[in-house]
Every structure is written in C-alpha cells, then in structure tokens.
Regions:
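Extracytoplasmic gate region of multi-pass secondary transporters
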Residues: 1, 185-211
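Residue-level signature of mid-helix packing/kink "hotspots" within the transmembrane helices
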Residues: 23-31, 118-119
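Helix-to-loop junctions at the C-terminal end of transmembrane segments
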Residues: 29-41
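C-terminal ends and interior cores of transmembrane alpha-helices
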Residues: 51-65
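Hydrophobic core of transmembrane alpha-helices in multi-pass small-molecule transporters
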Residues: 67-85, 195
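Intracellular juxtamembrane helix-capping segments at the cytosolic ends
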Residues: 84-98
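Helix-loop-helix hairpin linking two adjacent transmembrane segments in secondary transporters
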Residues: 110-157
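Flexible cytoplasmic inter-helical loops of multi-pass small-molecule transporters
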Residues: 157-176
C-alpha cells in the first residue's frame, strides 16, 4: 500500500493506525452483528455488513480519503463491516442449519473456505496493485462486494426444525450472553488465540510489505 503514501500523502503511521482501528472494530462489532443475526436473521446482518463495506471502499476510492477520512473509510467503516462479512456470522448461520452430528463438518468447511480466501486475497491484491494500481484494485473489490451483497439476499433463514437441538434462551440479554461465553474455557482460549493472530498476522501483513 505504498501507493497510498505517494498518491494520498498517507504515512505508514497513518496507514498502520487505520488497520489497527479496522482490526479493533472487527472484533468489537462481530458480537453486535451476531446479535442482529439472532434477532432479525443472518441474511439481514450480512447484507448490512456488505453495505457498510461497500460504502467504506467507495469513499476510499472516490470520496474524501485523506487525513481523518482515510481513518473513517479504511478503519471505521471497513472494520465495522468485517464484523458481519468475515467468518463469525456466516459460520454461525451455517451451523444453525445442521444437527449436532453434522455441524462440526459444516462449519469446518466454511472456516476452511474462508482460510483459503485469506490466503488468496493478499496475492490477488498485490498483483492487482502492481499491474493496475490502487484505484482499479478498489473497483475490483467493489465488484466482489456487490456479489456478496446479492448473495446475502439469498441466504436461507434458519428453520425451526434445523435448529431444534440448539438450546436458546429467548430472554437472555446481550450482556448475559457475553458473561456466559467467558465462563466457557474453550471460548476464552479462542479469544486469546485471536489476540495472537492479530499481533503476528495483521502486523506482518500491514508493515512487512513496506520493506
């Protein structure tokens, strides 16, 4: 992303700050979008996420995109959108369609597919930046976002029969759900694992290319 530094006068520090805001909001908004998915349906939560994603990328491409606006588009909006469009909500929604016996396999396939995407996307982005520039690369991202936006419309709502073996407390509040989650050892270890992921993978992806 050295093109940002040259064309938008965005320093590496400002770019790193935007990615930091993005990662923070990704983690912060994922439970909120999960709440929306439980209340109103996963298709609506993912659709909203792609709308915010598209707005962030469009502003980065064609709107005010320097200074604080760079943090707003790449940091605030894209980070918020990732809370709905990354793995958490889709994995949860897919899992609701399967019984306990098949749920692990189904969610594993979704997670593995997302991991392949995480591997391919940086390679595609790097190639596109070199060959076509950052503006065209953002346009390509907008195309993918539109595809995701359309696909989210056809996300099938969960039928009661598909999730009948999932114990759900309809009266449980959001705060109570968070407290319950942190009493589960596996959940705590998973959260710690994502902290490690952020410190090494996000750090490498953000700063190493400059060198």
């Amino acid at each position: 992303f050295l093109d940002f530094e040259n064309d938008l006068n965005v320093s590496r520090t400002e770019f790193g700050l935007a990615i930091g805001i993005q990662m923070f909001l990704w983690g912060l908004t994922a439970p909120l979008f999960g709440l929306l998915a439980d209340k109103f349906g996963g298709n609506k939560a993912v659709f909203l996420g792609f709308l915010v994603f598209g707005l962030g990328i469009f502003l980065l491409y064609n709107g005010p995109n320097t200074g604080i606006y760079f943090q707003l588009s790449l940091g605030l909006l894209v980070g918020t959108a990732l809370g709905a469009t990354a793995m958490s909500v889709p994995v949860s929604e897919v899992g609701k369609h399967f019984s306990n016996e098949k749920r692990t396999l189904a969610t594993g396939i979704v997670t593995a597919s997302a991991s392949v995407g995480y591997f391919i996307t940086p390679l595609f982005t790097k190639y596109s930046l070199i060959e076509f520039g950052w503006q065209n690369t953002l346009v390509y991202y907008l195309y993918f976002i539109v595809i995701g936006l359309i696909a989210s419309i056809f996300l099938i709502p969960v039928k009661k029969s598909s999730s009948q073996d999932i114990q759900i407390d309809k009266n449980q509040t959001f705060i109570a759900a968070i407290k319950e989650a942190f009493t589960h050892k596996g959940y705590v270890l998973l959260v710690c694992g994502f902290f490690v992921c952020g410190f090494q993978i996000a750090l490498v992806a953000t700063h190493i290319p400059a060198y």
